[in-house]
Amino acid sequence: MSEGSNSTSAAASTQRQVRVQLTSKQEDIALPENTGPILVPTGLRRYALSTLVNNLLGNDKPIPFEFLINGSFLRTSIDEYLTANGISAETTLEIEYVRALIPPLHIASFEHDDWVSSVDVLSTTSPAASLASATIAAGQERILSGSYDGLLRVWNMSSQIVATSPSAADGGHTASIKAAKFISPNSIVSAGLDRTVRVWKYSEDGDGFSGKIAPQLELYGHKGPINSLSVHAPSNRILSASSDHSIGFWSTKKSDAPAAPEDLLPSAALRSSKRRKLNSSVTIPQRGPLALLSSHSAPVSAAIFDSNDSTVGYSASWDHSLRTWDLVTATLVDTRTTSHSLLSLEHLPEHHLLAAGTSARHITLIDPRVSATTIAAMTLRGHTNAVVSLARDPKSSYGLISGSHDGTCRIWDIRATKTDKDGVVGESVYSISRKSLEEQGKSEAKRIGGEGVKVFGVAWDGTVGIVSAGEDKRIQINRGEGVLSSA
């Protein structure tokens, strides 16, 4: 008797149904507005739901979908979700569907002579072009790289070098470059171990195969290596993060900038007669900072502008703290102290969050608003070494890419979460390894700590894709159409 009742109960559970209202914020895949709630078995999982939506849309070629309930991805059956969240099957369940991840495939790798520390992209969709209302023709996108050999290079999409910055003798960097960005289609900024921020004029010949990176302005103020740069082109402003524990606030226009501190300028005694001779035709204006922001007690790894308000800046440091600055008055507004050294920083403005990569192998999402009651809103786990570079998904407010010394880049969707003893934890939705390992036949091999393949910099562009730079002396480009759903 009991066996029969058990089988009846199991059948009832299997046959249990729930009303679901399927919606999408993406117009091209949305169901008609008059589509009402649908009765479905609670045993359905993602694949069956995806089939259902494709049938309702009448798609000849199925589109893989992901499903969100209350802002989090469905990773179980509907029944398990209802049970875990104490929701009655009598309620109508709102389920949002979005396009599933398309793995970002390897497109190309550009080889260098030395480690590549930094990358940036110039395309119609990149900030440098869109803020300048410039149109970059398809196929004419450019990639900027900064290298440990002290040189900047601008590449075309066919892996050809269009332009290289001058050597130290001709007005270039005198040590390794750690950061490089396009300010506009004809302006570049870079910084590194020589403690200077340098602004360059970029121009191309009519054939599009050759160009010039010419020194335009040298900015002095830091007393230690510069680790990262952030640019706000409309206001002609730059932020720099330095190992001297300070943040530099600069103007890209020499007419706005104060005189450079005399004690930091290259001493005349250090200039050899050979260099003087070479430099006789190169006269580069030298200026100082608008302000040096000092409060951190250890090297500053990153400094960025608030995405919505360029008068606000944020900095992350090895001293474990995230600091908010009023850039108009050059004053400290707020300090958030975490448990680990912070090595990288990115703003997710739609969610009022800052993502900070840490020495403890994870990414902490921090709400910088004074009203926030907790420091860490969420933790993203998956890397096995320090997280040293972050970039926002240009097409989704939920997306983030991270570059790590473990030799991988990871794509995150902050809706892909689980809850454990440490609170809300995010899991990466895709991991990108270095193509150089695969070519050596070691794609499955685990490099201890990412030895030889550390990722130093990453950029995510809406046109070109994910561009990463590393210890393998390469820029690597990966692209997957609509990697995350937009929102």
Curated annotation (Swiss-Prot):
Residues 18-99 are annotated as: Ubiquitin-like (UBL) domain. Component of the NOP7 complex, composed of erb1, nop7 and ytm1. The complex is held together by erb1, which interacts with nop7 via its N-terminal domain and with ytm1 via a high-affinity interaction between the seven-bladed beta-propeller domains of the 2 proteins. The NOP7 complex associates with the 66S pre-ribosome. Interacts (via UBL domain) with mdn1 (via VWFA/MIDAS domain). Its main location: nucleus. Keywords: Nucleus, Repeat, Ribosome biogenesis, rRNA processing, WD repeat. InterPro entries: G-protein_beta_WD-40_rep (IPR020472), NLE (IPR012972), WD40/YVTN_repeat-like_dom_sf (IPR015943), WD40_repeat_CS (IPR019775), WD40_repeat_dom_sf (IPR036322), WD40_rpt (IPR001680), WDR12/Ytm1 (IPR028599). GO terms for molecular function: ribonucleoprotein complex binding. Belongs to the WD repeat WDR12/YTM1 family. WD repeats lie at residues 126-165, 172-210, 221-260, 295-335, 337-376, 382-422, 450-487. Coiled coil: none annotated. Component of the NOP7 complex, which is required for maturation of the 25S and 5.8S ribosomal RNAs and formation of the 60S ribosome. GO terms for biological process: chromosome organization; maturation of 5.8S rRNA from tricistronic rRNA transcript (SSU-rRNA, 5.8S rRNA, LSU-rRNA); maturation of LSU-rRNA from tricistronic rRNA transcript (SSU-rRNA, 5.8S rRNA, LSU-rRNA); protein-RNA complex remodeling. It comes from the Eukaryota. It is found in: Nucleus, Nucleolus; Nucleus, Nucleoplasm. This is Ribosome biogenesis protein ytm1. GO terms for cellular component: nucleoplasm; PeBoW complex; preribosome, large subunit precursor.
